[in-house]
């Protein structure tokens, strides 16, 4: 059996989301701070969840900077740490379940396990999207996320973008894998419809079972009683007339008997006065009326 499309799509999107979330969690690039007083114009400070890095003209990058404003103690940073780590752990668990559920090395996948992995991956995407959105909401609030006063400016950095992308990919991949529940639910519904009832109802009226003799059915009815249009066997078929081969031969016309003697001679009006055969002998070879 070929791997369903929803499973293949989920198995592609989920690892990509895991990689992006892992990079966004570890990289010090959630917020970009620049425009410091009494420092070169090109000095920039990248703040992350675990570290700060100072960069100047893209040539020198120094990490492990001292937190002078209490940035790491801010509530959005602490919550983001916990939720991002939880999201990564849930993603790993979901991928493990998906690998066991899809089972590309076997013919039939495990739809229940694949659907469960989709639910876990979807939850992992939510756990990654919540801290990223919350951090972005308070990005410019210096009371919540401490930062130097103006003219210092704060901007969104690349780690937030990676977090958004990774979380969205996990949501899509988890939803795609969760669609694997559809064949399993369909099969269960079919089993319930085809399953036997709880038990036969007991009738209050006593019934009498009468066995009627089965009538002898004709051979044609026996073969057509199942509702299928099947031809009867050869012994019950009527023999078809054989086609005539050739052409009819001409037959001679029947010959009729002809007599050259006029049998009506002497029966006309002219012969009424003539003497009959009884008075004088008949010259004709035919018998006379008196002889009849």
From Swiss-Prot:
Region (Disordered): 222-292
Entry keyword set: Cell junction, Cell membrane, Membrane, Tight junction, Transmembrane, Transmembrane helix
Topology Extracellular: residue spans: 25-81, 132-160
GO molecular function, one term: identical protein binding
Major location category of this protein: other
One CC-aspect GO term: bicellular tight junction
Entry superkingdom: Eukaryota
Subcellular location(s) of the protein: Cell junction, Tight junction; Cell membrane
Tissue: Expressed in germinal center B-cells, placenta, stomach as well as in colon tumor.
Residue stretches spanning the membrane: 4-24, 82-102, 111-131, 161-181
Membrane topology: Multi-pass membrane protein
Biased composition (Polar residues): 273-282
Keyword Cell membrane: yes
Pfam families given in the database record: PMP22_Claudin (PF00822)
Gene Ontology BP annotations: bicellular tight junction assembly; calcium-independent cell-cell adhesion via plasma membrane cell-adhesion molecules; cell adhesion
InterPro entries: Claudin (IPR006187), Claudin_CS (IPR017974), PMP22/EMP/MP20/Claudin (IPR004031)
PANTHER family linked to this entry: CLAUDIN
Function, as annotated: Plays a major role in tight junction-specific obliteration of the intercellular space, through calcium-independent cell-adhesion activity.
Family designation: Belongs to the claudin family.
Descriptive protein name: Claudin-23
Lineage: Eukaryota, Metazoa, Chordata, Craniata, Vertebrata
């Amino acid at each position: 059996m070929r791997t369903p499309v929803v499973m293949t799509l989920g198995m592609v999107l989920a690892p990509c989301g895991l990689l992006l979330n892992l990079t966004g969690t570890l990289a010090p690039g959630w917020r970009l701070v620049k425009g410091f007083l009494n420092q070169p114009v090109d000095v920039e400070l990248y703040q992350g969840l675990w570290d700060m890095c100072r960069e100047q003209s893209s040539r020198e990058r120094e990490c492990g900077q001292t937190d002078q404003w209490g940035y790491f103690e801010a509530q959005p940073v602490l919550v983001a740490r916990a939720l991002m780590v939880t999201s990564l752990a849930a993603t790993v668990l979901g991928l493990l379940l998906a690998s066991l559920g899809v089972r590309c090395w076997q013919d039939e996948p495990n739809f229940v396990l694949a659907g469960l992995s989709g639910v876990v991956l979807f939850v992992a995407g939510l756990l990654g999207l919540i801290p990223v959105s919350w951090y972005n909401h308070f990005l410019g609030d210096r009371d919540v996320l401490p930062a130097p006063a103006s003219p210092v400016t704060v901007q969104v950095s690349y780690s937030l973008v990676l977090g958004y992308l990774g979380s969205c990919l996990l949501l899509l991949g988890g939803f795609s894998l969760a669609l694997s529940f559809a064949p399993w639910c369909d099969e269960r519904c079919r089993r319930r419809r085809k399953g036997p009832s709880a038990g036969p109802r007991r009738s209050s009226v006593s019934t009498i079972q009468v066995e009627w003799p089965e009538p002898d059915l004709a051979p044609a009815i026996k073969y057509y009683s199942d509702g299928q249009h099947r031809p009867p066997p050869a012994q019950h078929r009527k023999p078809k007339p054989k086609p005539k081969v050739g052409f009819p031969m001409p037959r001679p016309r029947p010959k009729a008997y002809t007599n050259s003697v006029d049998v009506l001679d002497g029966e006309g009006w002219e012969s009424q006065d003539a003497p009959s055969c009884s008075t004088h002998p008949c010259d004709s070879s035919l018998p006379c009326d008196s002889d009849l």
